[in-house]
């Protein structure tokens, strides 16, 4: 049982050194398990790097995992049966339902619950409470230090009520992703996979309390735990003074791991130091090496180009100012095209990093399209504006609002109702002219005429009205029942979607976008039906037998859809 750190600057080769060490040891000890734990988003790349580093081009006794994947591996091995894991969409649904029941008791949150995205923010706060071990006692202790007249006091009081209701609902039913690692920590001692293994942690800037508790258990059963730490040679990694010093996160991580190792009875080995005057990554780039060394330091050192560098330096750092994001994106696209044409770069060698990708995404996509640059946007897109989602939301709104003019034509304009644009225009003009609104008026035959409506036109409009009313009649009857459960509404909506062949219509839209070369939209429509069906499954499994008003169901649906995102995969993967 031991703990060892690999220390070095950014670009000094910590990961390379670690992977080579792991590969070499794994070949010498094929009977031993080697686990490389990295953040979730780096697991695939780490697997590729390890395979590339291995002389045989493959890894047999080495696994690259995230903490969550490790949990599933261990649970599968030890046969531990735990409650189902509640994901973020499920949390949103449960919190929205609990907050709705507590609405009259909430002072601050009450007026914000219906705002788009607010439930997701409350969910994030509760998730962080669980992740960082903030229980009700700690929350109460903190609130005691606040004035009872302060806004923060009442806001925390509301969050505590929702948090308490959330915990009560989950008890003996579900566990959250944040609690998975606590469950894993209890299972570590039963795992043969972990006993005597070598565990490496790479790419982390710090660990949450629940991760520290897990690492403590891993130290007790493994042969060795190795951790890479990004830190400068001028800093002492074993002394953490305050959170505002340089490399504070790294120092905090090292000191907390050292204490954890001591408490677990593990030896702290001498650290491997990969300090170099110029980190390996920047050996051909003195400007970047200087920036890495001096950024955020209070020295007055300035970079001065040496004579022998005048020809080799490429102007690695440059600053440019433009009028708006669109001009910025165009400049970036021009620069990328120049690098590819004149300096033999490949598109996959280039990354564009934006402080707010949502602000720049459209401008970058258009600029890259203009210059014929293939681009992959690494961000998730909300499905709230998808036509199928709008079809679903407007369908329920139409029933809840009793066929108001706005709700009816919001639904018809989604393009998925089976009417042509010309037919919808004619219906809309007639309804506007004669103030047709309310379900009763849509059920009754239309007999009044406008100056431009002839007998044949009126007959055709009534034919369209009958088609629309008859197709929605069964669903509307269920939705208007006074007593109905979440299961009743969900089943009725699902059967209506099947009746209207929405899955086939969405597949046709996906093909249309593919034929047009709009691959991002094609990917979105390929996923959206499945996402909504999975959300319906969560409705039934989490809240199925609860009675619910249609208005509350609409809000519940919005809360679930807020968290639902579609994401495209990088073509390289």
Locations of regions flagged by a protein language model:
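Accessory C-terminal helicase-associated subdomains
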Residues: 149-156, 164-165, 169, 310-316, ...
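Extended, H/D-rich, highly charged conserved domains that either
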Residues: 206-280
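ATPase/helicase motor core of nucleic-acid motors
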Residues: 55, 70, 104-106, 339-349, ...
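Conserved helicase core region in the C-terminal RecA-like lobe
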Residues: 63-69, 198-207, 211, 226, ...
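PLD-like (HKD) phosphodiesterase/transphosphatidyltransferase domain
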Residues: 5-10, 167-216, 319-339, 474-513, ...
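Accessory N-terminal region flanking or inserted into the helicase ATPase core
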Residues: 2-6, 14, 101-203, 210, ...
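Helicase P-loop NTPase motor core
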Residues: 2-4, 10-26, 32, 40, ...
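Conserved P-loop NTPase-based nucleic-acid remodeling module centered on helicase motor cores
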Residues: 31-141, 147
